Amino acid sequence: TPQDVRDHPLSRADAVTGKAEKLKASTEPFDGNVGDATPLPGGGLLYSRNSALAPTDLFVRDAKGKVSQLTNVHAAQMAQFDQVEFDRLQFAGANGDKVWGIILKPVNPAQKIPVAFVVHGGPQGSFGNSWSTRWNPRLIAQQGYGVVSIDFHGSSGYGQAFTHSINKDWGGRA
């Protein structure tokens, strides 16, 4: 699935025209990271999906677009976690370009909370809306932190010009 902003949405492409179409892959506001899409008889799709809030499970999208979750492998572990809020932010970066980020924070914190600014490496990569076993914003927020992660200039998922914009200038246009 192609990257689009912070997500890797479920998509389909017309083999003749090359025109791509995003397909809803989740009952949540954002699709997260969709992969392993396999066509099913009758026009449905089987796929894996994870997000910044939840590890990978299997889903099916029927021919009419109805999404159903088939597995909930980590339900017992996830039930032990406190709820966190997830949101996106957008602001004007260098050259007035749109720059995107995500924020995760404990729900209704009783006091001011410290903030962890989580930055992806690369620099041409992305810290998308996906579950990570290496550096996990959801698990950092679980410890009482607000988490901010920005896809600065050079990040992937925003077009080649945006990704290439920091070539030979890593610190100048972030």
Where are these regions (language model features)?
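Short loop/turn segments that connect beta-strands within beta-propeller blades
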Residues: 14-18, 62-65
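Blade-edge beta-strand/turn elements of extracellular beta-propeller
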Residues: 18-26
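Conserved catalytic/ligand-binding micro-motifs in nucleotide and anionic cofactor chemistry
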Residues: 10-12
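Serine-hydrolase catalytic core recognition
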Residues: 25, 29-174
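Generic N-terminal initiation segments characterized by hydrophobic and/or small/turn-forming residues
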Residues: 7, 20, 42-43
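Short, solvent-exposed loop/turn segments at conserved positions within beta-propeller repeat blades
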Residues: 2-8, 51-54
